[in-house]
């Protein structure tokens, strides 16, 4: 079965670079990465950075996770990300998403040995 680390990669990593101006990016990616099976996953973020750079976040700034756990980490630098949000007129199985590109700091939960990201917690605008 899929490990938590592999699930994180499937759901959140797209290192091929930014999707530029493809408005269908989220529709295509959410489907190809199996996040529209059984339901339309409401929100998902893809990170367009090398996997090693995202894994390195586990050794950066320790922050509190949204659920109160203490194993979350915030990236020291901004990363290119794409936020996918299901549209209000979206009707399963025809999941439809709005694609928005951002440059933000990311927050991930890490666990295991090796210590790697297993959950995408948030993206935050970097403080100036």
From Swiss-Prot:
Q: Which cysteines are joined by disulfide bonds?
A: 26-84, 40-95, 58-110, 65-72
Q: Which reaction does it catalyse?
A: an [RNA] containing cytidine + H2O = an [RNA]-3'-cytidine-3'-phosphate + a 5'-hydroxy-ribonucleotide-3'-[RNA]; an [RNA] containing uridine + H2O = an [RNA]-3'-uridine-3'-phosphate + a 5'-hydroxy-ribonucleotide-3'-[RNA]
**Where in the sequence is the active site?**
12 (proton acceptor), 119 (proton donor)
The record's section on Pfam families has: RnaseA
Which positions in this protein are listed as binding substrate? 7, 10, 41-45, 66, 85
EC number(s) per UniProt?
A: 4.6.1.18
- Keywords, alphabetical: Disulfide bond, Endonuclease, Glycoprotein, Hydrolase, Lyase, Nuclease, Secreted
List the GO biological process terms. defense response to Gram-positive bacterium
Region (Disordered) residue ranges read 1-28
Domain of life, per UniProt, equals Eukaryota
Q: Keyword Lyase: yes or no?
A: yes
Predominant localisation class:
secreted
Write out the GO MF terms: lyase activity; nucleic acid binding; ribonuclease A activity
Q: Which family does it belong to?
A: Belongs to the pancreatic ribonuclease family.
The UniProt function text for this chain reads:
Endonuclease that catalyzes the cleavage of RNA on the 3' side of pyrimidine nucleotides. Acts on single-stranded and double-stranded RNA.
Listed name of the protein: Ribonuclease pancreatic
């Amino acid at each position: 079965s899929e490990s938590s680390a592999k699930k994180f990669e499937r759901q959140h990593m797209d290192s091929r670079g930014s999707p530029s101006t493809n408005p269908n990016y989220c529709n295509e990616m959410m489907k190809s990465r199996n996040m529209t099976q059984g339901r339309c996953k409401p929100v998902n973020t893809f990170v367009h950075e090398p996997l090693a750079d995202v894994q390195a976040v586990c050794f950066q700034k320790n922050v509190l996770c949204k659920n109160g756990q203490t194993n979350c980490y915030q990236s020291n630098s901004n990363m290119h990300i794409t936020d996918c949000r299901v549209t209000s007129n979206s009707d399963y199985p025809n999941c439809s998403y709005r694609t928005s590109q951002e440059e933000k700091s990311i927050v991930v939960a890490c666990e295991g040995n090796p210590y790697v990201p297993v959950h995408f917690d948030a993206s935050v605008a970097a403080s100036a």
